[in-house]
Amino acid sequence: MTIFALSSGPGVSGVAIIRISGPESSKVIKSLTSKEIPVPRMATLRKINNINTSELIDEGIILWFPGPESYTGEDMAEIHIHGGKAVILSLQNEISKIDNC
């Protein structure tokens, strides 16, 4: 099972971080960006889209941490997005559509 959560804390902020950990982490990033996984540990700017409509959700920074050399020991990704509630909820909704997340 792949898990995801807001790791930057609740409330209004300029930037929010969604952390994803587990075997489907790479699938999540590929599905949201329609691009390959970025170079490990290198911040990469990407457009983050609705999986079904390709509508832009936000433009954010993706960080990829392959396991076992990650914070959790599993494949892991961080998505740094704008901190508004609508953006956060939209991204969490899209991730939840992916099998095993």
What is each model feature region?
Residues 1-101:
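A glycine-rich (often HGG/GG-containing) alpha/beta subdomain
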